Amino acid sequence: MTILGIDPGTRKMGYALISLEKGKIALIEAGLIKIKAEELQFQIPQMVEAFEGIFKNHKIDEVAIEDIFYAHNPKTTIKLAQFRGAIMLMLIQQFGQFSEYTALQVKKALTGNGKATKEQVAFMAKRLLNIKKEIKPLDITDAIAVAITHSQRVRLKQQ
């Protein structure tokens, strides 16, 4: 089974594809989608095009996305919500469904602590996947963590 994890953002989005076979997880691919356009009306199609490339190149069985958080700037929160709405529509059209996890759920799933730092989550994501090299930026490890969190839920359902 291939799981796509997404860490949404307004300028850059982390994504990660992991495989789940016989209870074991492995990283297939992870990366960053950079949004270069300045206006929302051009940013969203740019993001959709990037994801369509990922969908074409991989057989994806399950998708998980990190839920929205409240930013200190209301404009940023609104823009992130608009991007998530576009992503959600795209995922429903492509896969029929997707799962959502809050940052707290992801942190707890990987570290056991809902107040873990991004660096602690990144450390555990790399450890669980036996990755030795550094992965930057943290948007990528956040997406990996979302995918791992979903893999844990899938494993529980299979038992």
Curated annotation (Swiss-Prot):
PROSITE patterns: RUVC. It is found in: Cytoplasm. Its EC number is 3.1.21.10. It comes from the Bacteria. Its main location: cytoplasm. Mg(2+) 1 binds at residues 7, 139. The active site is at residues 7, 66, 139. Keywords: Cytoplasm, DNA damage, DNA recombination, DNA repair, DNA-binding, Endonuclease, Hydrolase, Magnesium, Metal-binding, Nuclease. Its cofactor is Mg(2+). Binds 2 Mg(2+) ion per subunit. GO terms for biological process: DNA recombination; DNA repair. GO terms for molecular function: crossover junction DNA endonuclease activity; DNA binding; magnesium ion binding. Homodimer which binds Holliday junction (HJ) DNA. The HJ becomes 2-fold symmetrical on binding to RuvC with unstacked arms; it has a different conformation from HJ DNA in complex with RuvA. In the full resolvosome a probable DNA-RuvA(4)-RuvB(12)-RuvC(2) complex forms which resolves the HJ. The RuvA-RuvB-RuvC complex processes Holliday junction (HJ) DNA during genetic recombination and DNA repair. Endonuclease that resolves HJ intermediates. Cleaves cruciform DNA by making single-stranded nicks across the HJ at symmetrical positions within the homologous arms, yielding a 5'-phosphate and a 3'-hydroxyl group; requires a central core of homology in the junction. The consensus cleavage sequence is 5'-(A/T)TT(C/G)-3'. Cleavage occurs on the 3'-side of the TT dinucleotide at the point of strand exchange. This is Crossover junction endodeoxyribonuclease RuvC. It comes from Sulfurimonas denitrificans (strain ATCC 33889 / DSM 1251). The gene is ruvC.
